[in-house]
Structures are given as C-alpha cells and as structure tokens.
Amino acid sequence: MELIVYSSPWCGDCREAKRFLAKHNISYKEINIEEVPDAAQEVIAHTGKRAIPQFVIDGKWVQPYTPGKGFHYEEMSKLLGIE
C-alpha cells in the first residue's frame, strides 16, 4: 500500500492523523503544503478545497476528518486494514 499524507505543521488534525499512523506503524510519505511547491494547488485540484489532512491511498484521495469534529479513526482503520 502506498500512502501519501498532505499536511502542515500548524494543522492539529494533521498531527492527530500522524499520531494515529505512528501508533499503528504505518509508513507514509508526507507532503507539507507550505513547503512543497504547488502541493496546496494539487490538493485543491483533487478535492475542490484547501483542506488538510488529505490522504492518498494507492492513488485514491481520502479526507480522514470532518472540520471541527476531528479525525475519523474507524473509517481510516478500515481503509488502512487495521483491526
């Protein structure tokens, strides 16, 4: 499985998502939208908004949280094959 996480250091939901991935020993490539040229535009092009974190799992874009409500642990566990 290839996992890419679009994030930024100031994003609380991004930090929570990365803690979840670390807890389950899931490797991923992180793309910081503040540092990588055109990364924010890529997020907008695929999702229609500049919202992070965004996960790309084997080429499929997934938003693992609801703004103001937090990270979706159960949904991401299913998508990542965590029991």
Regions found by a protein language model. Give the residues of each.
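Local sequence-structure signature of Cys/Sec-based thiol-disulfide redox active-site neighborhoods
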Residues: M1-I26
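Short alpha-helical
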Residues: G12, D38, F71
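Non-catalytic, surface beta->alpha helical segment in thiol-disulfide oxidoreductase systems
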Residues: I57-E83
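Thiol/disulfide oxidoreductase modules built on the thioredoxin-like
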Residues: I44-A51, V62-G68
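Thioredoxin-like thiol-disulfide oxidoreductase module
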Residues: N32-R50, V56, K78-E83
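Nucleotide phosphate-binding site architecture
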Residues: G12, E34, Q63
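Conserved beta-strand scaffold positions in the cores of enzyme catalytic domains, especially
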Residues: Y28-E30, W61
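Alpha-helical elements of the RecA-like P-loop NTPase motor core of helicases
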Residues: R15, R19, Q41, E74
